[in-house]
């Protein structure tokens, strides 16, 4: 009996010490490299998701990625929760930034882009980025600095 109590106490100490590793993040957020992340299952447009993130915490936005390790972390927390393929990330309007050229070398002097802006989703299985109309609805991940 004394051994059981000792083991239980030891496990409690380990649990409490590990729970402090993400102490700068709220309990329902995950911690990685000084940032807090939370997966939201509800589906929203890109703009609504970004506004929702901003309402959750000061300086919170749709997730941004800055290393392959961060992506691996995001995949590890996103896919098990959503079991979905695509989530909004904090990129949009990439076509306005691209340098376009025709394969024959002529100048791009005529453009017929859709009126609707494009935003970016990430595949939760392998982090491939895909542009989608911002008006579509997807789940999303919010991020803020701890």
From Swiss-Prot:
InterPro entries in the record: C-type_lectin-like (IPR001304), C-type_lectin-like/link_sf (IPR016186), C-type_lectin/snaclec_domain (IPR050111), C-type_lectin_CS (IPR018378), CTDL_fold (IPR016187)
The C-type lectin domain, residue ranges:
32-143
- What are the protein's UniProt keywords? Disulfide bond, Hemostasis impairing toxin, Secreted, Signal, Toxin
Highest taxon in the source lineage: Eukaryota
Q: Where does the record say this protein resides?
A: Secreted
Query: Which Gene Ontology cellular component terms are annotated?
Result: extracellular region
Give start-end ranges for the coiled-coil region(s): none
Pfam families, A to Z: Lectin_C
One function term, GO molecular function aspect: toxin activity
The principal location of this protein is secreted
The cross-references to PANTHER family, in alphabetical order and at most eight, read: MANNOSE, PHOSPHOLIPASE, LECTIN RECEPTOR RELATED
Query: What subunit structure does UniProt give?
Result: Heterodimer; disulfide-linked.
Miscellaneous field: Shows greater sequence similarity to the beta than alpha subunits compared to other heterodimer snaclecs.
Role: Interferes with one step of hemostasis (modulation of platelet aggregation, or coagulation cascade, for example).
What's this protein's name?
Snaclec 1
Gene source species: Sistrurus catenatus edwardsii (Desert massasauga)
Please name the taxonomic classification of the source.
Eukaryota, Metazoa, Chordata, Craniata, Vertebrata
């Amino acid at each position: 009996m004394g051994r059981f109590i000792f083991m239980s106490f030891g496990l409690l100490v380990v649990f409490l010490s590990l729970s402090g590793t993400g102490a700068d993040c709220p309990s329902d957020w995950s911690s990685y490299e000084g940032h807090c992340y939370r997966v939201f299952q509800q589906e929203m447009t890109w703009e609504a998701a970004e506004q929702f993130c901003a309402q959750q915490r000061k300086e919170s936005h749709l997730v941004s990625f800055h290393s392959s390790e961060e992506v691996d972390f995001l995949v590890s927390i996103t896919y098990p929760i959503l079991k979905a393929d695509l989530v909004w990330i904090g990129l949009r309007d990439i076509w306005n930034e691209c340098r376009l050229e025709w394969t024959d070398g002529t100048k791009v002097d005529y453009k017929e882009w859709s009126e609707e802006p494009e935003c970016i989703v990430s595949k939760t299985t392998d982090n491939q980025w895909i542009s989608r109309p911002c008006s579509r609805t997807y789940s999303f991940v919010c991020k803020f600095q701890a």
